[in-house]
Amino acid sequence: MLNTLIVGASGYTGAELALYLNRHPQMNITALMVSAQSVDAGKLISDLHPQLKGIIDVPVKPLTDAEEAAKGVDVVFLATDHKVSHDLAPVFLAAGCTVFDLSGAFRVQDAEFYRRYYGFEHQHPDWLAKAVYGLAEWRAESVKQAQLIAVPGCYPTAAQLALKPLLDAQLLNPAQWPVINAVSGVSGAGRKASMTNSFCEVSFQPYGIFNHRHEPEISTHLGTPVIFTPHLGNFARGILETITCRLQPGVTQQDVAEAYHNAYHDKPLVRLYDKGVPALKSVVGLPFCDIGFSVDGEHLIVVATEDNLLKGAAAQAVQCMNIRFGFPETQSLI
């Protein structure tokens, strides 16, 4: 039994983590924590998230001393802001904890990336170099050896799962960059109230055109440039990505299908569509990434869907934890 701590437990992702870990037979939640300044400190998590009533009726505690909080803890999940994770992770790591960071603080091993896209100077180059990028289906062997696992972003998870089999099989024409048009539910903006995500203001609209921080995350880990345009959808949760690519001359629909099958036939949390393409309703509330595609000559359109809070965050973090400690990969997830 592993003692685990969730920091940032009051948010949407933190609540999903609590639910998964509470029912995991190998995990013991020692505490649910939030920042010392949080207005949620001291409240029951089941009051903040009523779906947890009768399941997890414990208070979220203020984190005032990370070194003290780390005592007796084996595993820490950080569902916190990027700069908060940047500051907290090294403290828990120094205490010997294995850390799963759901922020962007350790995803890209390039200090300039953090200055440009996150607005802070990265102060922990050693941990940045040691961090393993937790794209579970592709980095399992590295995850097994890691102390710090940087859980991928929600958009990058779906994009990479959709594109990596095609790139590895050299099916795409490099003369045309993949074009990713992605839509996310409002929960991707977090639980904190703002004008952008208020009920009367929410609309279907693009944002972060040519400067969203997930574009370089996707490009870096795929090893190829992409054009990525995120959109805010007028729904609560889920991500749908429509990806347009150009195939190498002579590549067929069967070649594409075989590339996906070879990559994911033994990956339980990626579901492939033989016919048609997935819809959001098929993944919301579930830990899967669903992928379908269509070919017309040298043109390929791939559609990938996931729940942004689950496969795009909490479920992938728990999946990585299962891989790291040798548990069944889908334990507590399905």
UniProtKB/Swiss-Prot annotation:
SMART domains per the UniProt record, alphabetical: Semialdhyde_dh
GO biological process: L-arginine biosynthetic process
Pfam families according to UniProt: Semialdhyde_dh, Semialdhyde_dhC_1
CDD domains: AGPR_1_C (cd23934), AGPR_1_N (cd17895)
Main location: cytoplasm
Compartments it resides in: Cytoplasm
Pathway, per record: Amino-acid biosynthesis; L-arginine biosynthesis; N(2)-acetyl-L-ornithine from L-glutamate: step 3/4
EC number: 1.2.1.38
Catalytic residues (positions): C154
GO cellular component terms given for this protein: cytoplasm
SUPFAM superfamilies the UniProt entry points to: Glyceraldehyde-3-phosphate dehydrogenase-like, C-terminal domain (SSF55347), NAD(P)-binding Rossmann-fold domains (SSF51735)
InterPro entries hit by this protein: AGPR_AS, AGPR_type-1, NAD(P)-bd_dom_sf, NAGSA_dehydrogenase, Semialdehyde_DH_NAD-bd
Gene Ontology MF terms: N-acetyl-gamma-glutamyl-phosphate reductase activity; NAD binding; NADP+ binding
Coiled-coil residues: none
Keyword list, A-Z: Amino-acid biosynthesis, Arginine biosynthesis, Cytoplasm, NADP, Oxidoreductase
Catalytic activity: N-acetyl-L-glutamate 5-semialdehyde + phosphate + NADP(+) = N-acetyl-L-glutamyl 5-phosphate + NADPH + H(+)
Function: Catalyzes the NADPH-dependent reduction of N-acetyl-5-glutamyl phosphate to yield N-acetyl-L-glutamate 5-semialdehyde.
Alphabetical list of PANTHER family matching this protein: N-ACETYL-GAMMA-GLUTAMYL-PHOSPHATE REDUCTASE, CHLOROPLASTIC-RELATED, N-ACETYL-GAMMA-GLUTAMYL-PHOSPHATE REDUCTASE, CHLOROPLASTIC-RELATED-RELATED
Family to which the UniProt record says this protein belongs: Belongs to the NAGSA dehydrogenase family. Type 1 subfamily.
Protein name: N-acetyl-gamma-glutamyl-phosphate reductase
Source organism of the structure: Pectobacterium carotovorum subsp. carotovorum (strain PC1)
Taxon lineage: Bacteria, Pseudomonadati, Pseudomonadota, Gammaproteobacteria, Enterobacterales
